[in-house]
Amino acid sequence: TGQPACVASTIRICLHYGNLDVLEDGYGINMLPLATFALETYGDDPCECFAAKGGEDSGNSQQMLERRMHKAITVMQLKLENRLIRENPEYGMENRRLLEKIDYQNGTVTIGEKTYALRDKSFPTIDLAHPDELTEKEAEVLDKLIFAFRNSEKLQAHVDFLLKKGSLYRVYNGNLLYHGCMPMNEDGTLKEVQVDGKKYKGKALYDILEHNVRRAFVSRDPKKREQGRNTLWYLWTAPNSPLYGRDKMTTFERYFLAEKETWTEVKNAYYRLIEKEETADR
């Protein structure tokens, strides 16, 4: 569907693990607009926090280019996610509006009651008054990347296959099969999650989320299509998403903070309670 934050996240992950060829060669997605922008914007930045994970990074020209592309798309992703959270308070992710918690002059960020020094303090595309606003060039690059994703025949064929054959859960041969977790409270009761202004739990939660995902592809109402696209991002990262099931996704912390205790992602109570027979009986 070309959901902007999902597109940015996909590219970032490929760069993080040194798998950009999956997009370029596997799906025919042109990374030149991002590469050009990264060189123009971060050409003098060593981007040390953005070296690919695994393998040896000797700092050759190709690796330096990918580091800069990595930082460029990461900053775009953080902006897009910050805006999504701000515009959708029912996601319950206000504490993840981290771009608004950064002191850009001193190079620190306040998370909870603690203030941490940033490992990378250079943010040339951040508007201090509107930190989650894309620059004109960032928006232009993102539009080109989204166009490439939407027009990749192989990618669209794979997504069509998932929509035709896949589902969030299925009853098969007397067994209930489902992705991820069933969001629970600490006492083992099913957690109520707000979606589109109403509260859902258990099977009803899976049903409404799958309904919204499919709306992203088939609805003729632009607003509903947009809501559906945003649901795809919600499923990927939100604490109340059955597919994620952790209190937060610490992408920002892992790039910018040295304190590893900030990297912790606490799993939903489901993962502790599912081993108990009384939980299954509910």
Residue ranges and their predicted role:
Residues T1-R282:
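Feature recognizes metal-dependent phosphohydrolase scaffolds
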